[in-house]
Amino acid sequence: MASILDGRAELKAIIDQIAEVTGYLWQKGWAERNGGNITVNVTEYMDDECKAMKAIAPVKQIGMVLPLLKGKYFYCKGTGKRMRDLAKFPMQNGSIIRICDNCASYEVIADEPVVPTSELPTHLALQNYLLETGSCYKATLHTHPIELVAMSHIQRFLKGDEMTRVLWSMIPETLAFAPLGIGIVPYAMPSSVELAEATLEQIKTHDVVLWEKHGTVAVGTDIMDAFDQTDVLCKAANIYMCARSMGSEPDGMTSEQMKEVQDAFNLPKKRPC
């Protein structure tokens, strides 16, 4: 069967990277059953032949109007699809969609009529914001990192920047590779407009956002970048829990030590692009 990836090496490389990352998510235990979602802007890889492709499934409503997404193309994980299956067969467990001219609906164009994730409105709202701000970020990743979700069950870590402070203090690399810390979104019903709006607000100042008692959403230049930032923060959470399991609250790096790292590496205080 012909695929939209045939003869399009750059697009195939993006899809291959997505498949690689979904394998990591499964291996880490972050993607039970059909848990987690991925959306990547692939518009720049669409040639005239792709743009002329007709819909292969009925038009679906997004549930909101997203004016910056008119005519844009995204690879999306399918609803009910497993990350471990996507790692092997990305175009059977996800699809490429085109946003319609009304900016409020979409259609699947390739390869199979796989309906995107139920959390598509949240993902597309984030993509709309990234385009609105001129960001070079293309990918959104939702997953269930065990240690970070566990910490979200403790109220202390949901107040202010306490979780960011603790995670940064565990190992210098967390501060270096996740310099915007982690945003916190109080519990909201999955796939709800409330959750989408709260996530969008936190993404304005963070590359990774923690949904209380649920999971994380990360944005990045590509899907590997979004994964790496989540992975770095989860490693810090793991270190914290290992130290706690030895019977004491870990000391962590001091404020002075963390500032020294920030100054030495000239770490950004806002999204670099």
Name every feature range the model reports, one short phrase each.
Residues 1-273:
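Glycine-rich flexible loops
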